Amino acid sequence: MTTALTSHSNQLPDMPGINVLLMGPAGTGKTHSIGTAVDAGVELFGNSSLEVFYLGLEPGLESLKGYWTDAGKPIPPNIHWHSIKAPDIGFADMIDAAKMINTLSLDSLAKMQDAKRSKHNQFIAILEALANFPDDRTGEKFGAVNTWGSDRMLVIDGMAGLNRASLAMVVGGKPVKSQSDWGIAQDQVEKILRKICEDCKCHFILLGHVERETDQILGGVKIMISTLGKALAPKIPAMFSDVILTVRQGTKWTWDTSNSQADLKTRNLPIAADNPPDFAPVLKKWLARARAE
């Protein structure tokens, strides 16, 4: 069953939602903070509420659920989730691949094609989920993401899973990747992000890890989103309204929008190193601007 857009979508301003890239090292609270968006969706959007759809490409659902369960609270009804399954690759397949690596020359490995590449279909599963989002929680389907309004939010967790799925779609389990393989995979990741950021009106949050990359324009090294190769990372921030660095110092978690060593930007938060890890101010600022005449 596909659930149509609810009637309350017309009560919200007809303005595209926020596009937020939340990036940082592991353990800095990226997935956990999605709970603040769910809660803010109830507090700020009133009776209409903001429905949040979490697409898990990496292990993270446990952390998201823990935002409520660890505090002894029920999981709100406005959060939906779907987890993409890992490729159906067994240890026997890994043994076969290891034997080829152990016996074939580098040139032979580079020329080989993975006969089991069709098993690496995660990227296709991601697109299918975006074409008609299936809720693992209720069994309902909620239609294509590009038909949603600003009463809905898509969360993709995270960029590393998207990277792996795209590259595996191109090469399968082939151990040696050519420059063309990397280029095709990068192009697919860029296309899916541009489609969501530029052609969808729903709110969008992308979670990702970071790495240090050379700034090809200004020189030097900057903290950027971890993605395929070096050419794609500098293109990604321009697609988003906010690019935020997640930070943990001891037992304190913050969002940094001012770090000059990172490729950051913000439209909906103060430029500061110690913003609280909370989506409520971001959504509140968006609502104020969207309702302005």
Give short role names for the model-derived ranges.
Residues 23-25, 54-58, 156, 207-209, ...:
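Short His-Asn-centered micro-motif
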Residues 1-7, 14-18, 253-293:
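C-terminal regions of RecA-like/P-loop NTPase motor modules
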Residues 10-138, 143, 147-150, 161:
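Conserved P-loop
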Residues 65, 166-167, 250:
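Hydrophobic alpha-helical membrane-insertion segments
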Residues 40, 129-133, 162-165, 199, ...:
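Conserved, well-folded catalytic cores of nucleic-acid-processing
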Residues 5-6, 30, 189, 229:
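Amphipathic coiled-coil/heptad-repeat helices and related helical stalk/stem segments
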Residues 199-278:
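Phosphate-binding/switch region of NTP-binding enzymes
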Residues 143-235:
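P-loop NTPase motor core
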